[in-house]
Structure formats: structure tokens, C-alpha cells
């Protein structure tokens, strides 16, 4: 799976807005979480080009979460998960979870 890495961090794409998730609503395409081309389109605010790219590269994808995509840079090798509630996604790093022991 291709990933964009800068200064030891990996670009992770997520949709923080309520309504529709991005990777959480498209489990068939796990690579959309890291796709370097999508990262570039988001960073350059090229929404029309992004829409065309996603439609051609990922046929049948649900793209409701494409508006408002964000990039979070996570240290390479870190474990994380993408949580989703009502379409709004957030990224949770394993090292930042405070576990409670019974």
C-alpha cells in the first residue's frame, strides 16, 4: 500500500465532518486511507481534480465523505484506528489511549 511519508510521519486521510465517513464507509478500499495522490489533492485544495481521480481510481466508491477531507500526520510505525460517529471520523493513536484495569 502506497503511503506519503514526510519527516518521519505518514499522511492519513480522514473525514471529520458529520454526514459521511471516508475510510470507515469504504472498507472495500483500505488504500484510500493513505493514497498519496489524494493527499496531494487535499493539500492543494483541488476538489474537482480529487473527485475525478477518486471516481476513476475507485469505481463504485461511496464518496459522500470526500468534501472536507483532512490530513493527519502520524509518526511512521504508530498504531492507530479511525473512529466514526454519524459520519464524523477521528484518529486515535494507541499510545494516547488511557486504559483502565479491572
Feature locations, PLM:
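Catalytic phosphate/metal-binding cores of nucleic-acid and nucleotide-processing enzymes, i.e., regions
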Residues: 2-102
Amino acid at each position: 500500500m502506497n503511503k506519503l511519508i514526510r519527516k518521519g510521519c505518514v499522511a492519513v486521510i480522514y473525514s471529520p465532518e458529520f454526514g459521511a465517513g471516508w475510510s470507515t464507509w469504504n472498507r472495500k478500499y483500505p488504500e484510500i486511507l493513505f493514497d498519496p495522490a489524494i493527499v496531494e489533492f487535499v493539500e492543494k485544495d483541488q476538489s474537482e481534480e480529487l473527485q475525478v481521480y477518486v471516481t476513476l481510481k475507485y469505481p463504485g466508491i461511496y464518496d459522500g465523505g470526500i468534501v472536507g477531507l483532512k490530513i493527519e500526520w502520524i509518526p511512521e510505525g504508530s498504531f492507530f484506528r479511525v473512529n466514526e460517529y454519524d459520519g464524523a471520523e477521528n484518529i486515535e493513536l494507541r499510545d494516547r489511549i488511557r486504559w483502565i484495569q479491572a
